[in-house]
Amino acid sequence: MTAPQNPLERVTLRNPIHFLALGLGSGLLHPAPGTWGSLVGVVLGALLLPWLGAKTFFILTALCFFLGIWLCERTSHDMGVHDHGSIVWDEIVSVFLVLLAVPQVSLFWCAAAFVPFRLFDILKPYPIRYFDEKLTNGFGIMVDDILAAGYSILVILALAHFI
C-alpha cells in the first residue's frame, strides 16, 4: 500500500496532535485557512483573556507557543510538508499575543488585532519572510507568526495612542 499523495490524507482530527495543530479543525476551512485559524484565535482569546487576566493569559500563550513548536513539527512531519497551510496553531497563538496589547476586549479592538496580524502574516515584511524561509522546523513555523504579531502590536499601540 502506498502513502497518500494529499498531505491532508496523512492527518486526522482524531489525533489530538493534529487536531490542535490544525486549529481545532479550522485549518481545514477554505479559502484562506490561516484567516480561519486567526479568527479562532481571536474568539478564544476574547473569551479567555478577560476570564484569566492578562498575566495568566500571557503564561498560557507562552506555554501554547512552546507546545506549538512540537505540535507543528510533528504534524508537518506526518503530512510530509513543512508548514502546510492547514497548520494554524501558530496563527492562534500569535493572535493571543496581539490581544494582550489591546486596551480592552471589544469588537473594535478584536478587529484591530485581527486585521494587521493577517496583513503582516500574509505580506511577511522583513524579517518575517527570512525566518519563514530559513527555519524549516516547528520553531520556524511558530516564529514567523510571532514576528507578525510583534508588528501588529506596534499597530495596536499606535492606534491606542491616537484614539
Mark where each language-model region is.
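Membrane-interface alpha-helices
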Residues: 42-43, 47, 139-141
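Alpha-helical transmembrane segments of multi-pass membrane proteins
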Residues: 46, 61-70, 99, 113-122
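Interhelical loop and helix-boundary elements at the membrane-water interface
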Residues: 2-37, 70-98, 119-150
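Strongly charged, low-complexity linkers/loops
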Residues: 104-112, 117-124, 128
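Final/C-terminal transmembrane alpha-helix of multipass membrane proteins
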Residues: 145-161
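Helix-coil boundary and interhelical linker segments in multi-pass alpha-helical membrane proteins
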Residues: 45-59, 98-111, 157-163
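Short, surface-exposed acidic-centric catalytic microdomains
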Residues: 31-44, 56-72
